Amino acid sequence: MISDYDALLQFNKKPVSQEMIQFLATSTASIIKIRENNNPIQGCRPPDLSIFIKNVVIQSNVQTPTLMATSVYLNKLKSVIPKNVYGINTTRHRIFLGCLILAAKTLNDSSPWNKHWTTYTEGLLRIREVNTIERELLEYLNWDVRITTPDLIDSLSYFLGPIKEQLFLQRRQEMLLFNAPSPGQLKEYINHRRPVSHSRTSSAISVPSLTSMATVSTTDSRSSLLAKYQPSLPLVESDNFNKKNHVPLRNNNDICNNFRAEENIHSVNHIDVTMGSSPVMSHKPTIHQRLNFTRRGWSSFFKQ
């Protein structure tokens, strides 16, 4: 968030513009009313207030901080001078010149003397009148000529509002440019966003070899191959349901005799599995675990 103080510092760097002069002329005119003279003396009509301010600014070479500080004194005079008071044709010119003299002497170590300010008026005021204007303004302000930052912010709020918006947009643009990805990061991001190809030539998916493909076959297919080459075998007479081999046992001697009888039966009825040129496997083949084809991990977006 842009503060008023930052906007004020930015405003003080600007050169004096016609908008500033017109603002001061309007502020001075709102302090006191002028009673029109129906019979003005020829050659004594003062110049327009905005033209008078412009001529003084050009001849004195006053800068923006000193010039716009007069708005603080103008606001203070607005609360001091009564509303029902009327001035002469040069009253507003006198008020502005007195406020500018006070601002120049308060804010600068070295400022023009009153005789110099008299020449800046181009003959409108004399040196004695300029001295009187300065003393009267000091009495109106009770010799309180301090200019604080809150006073400037309050008096120049008309100019600070647009500057704050401009600074906000400028800093936002700078943040966007600062956080923008570099060309290398942008290229890496685009490459990571490309879809993975599933062609045979793509290296994103590992293709199993012909040897390992045999392990992917199902149990049913392997069983069908065994059934093709293995002949039907005779049943062994000594199965688990043979009553001759499974008689009730009475003691430990019977258990030992039963085990010996079973060994003799298996030795006699052993099946010879060597048959011609087509060997038959004596045990069921082991089905290996299926291969899990997984894509390579997607790269995450680049981090700022």
Curated annotation (Swiss-Prot):
Q: What induces it?
A: By transcription factor SWI5 in a cell cycle-regulated manner. Peaks in late M, early G1 phase (at protein level).
* Database matches in Gene3D superfamilies: Cyclin-like (1.10.472.10)
Keywords assigned: Cell cycle, Cell division, Cyclin
Gene Ontology molecular functions: cyclin-dependent protein serine/threonine kinase regulator activity; protein kinase binding
Q: Does the keyword Cell division apply?
A: yes
InterPro entries recorded: Cyclin-like_dom, Cyclin-like_sf, Cyclin_N, Cyclin_PHO80-like, PHO85_cyclin_1/2/9
Any keyword Cell cycle?
A: yes
Q: Which GO terms describe its cellular component?
A: cellular bud neck; cyclin-dependent protein kinase holoenzyme complex; incipient cellular bud site; nucleus
The stretch of residues making up the signal peptide is none
Q: Name one GO biological process term.
A: cell division
Q: Which residues form the Cyclin N-terminal domain?
A: 19-146
| A Pfam family it matches | Cyclin_N
Identify the PANTHER family for this entry: PHO85 CYCLIN-2-RELATED, PTHR15615
Q: What quaternary arrangement does the UniProt entry report?
A: Forms a cyclin-CDK complex with PHO85.
User: What job does the chain carry out?
Assistant: M/G1-specific cyclin partner of the cyclin-dependent kinase (CDK) PHO85. May have a role in bud site selection in G1 phase.
What protein family is recorded? Belongs to the cyclin family. PCL1,2 subfamily.
Q: What is this protein called?
A: PHO85 cyclin-9
The protein's organism comes out as Saccharomyces cerevisiae (strain ATCC 204508 / S288c)
Tell me the name of the encoding gene. PCL9
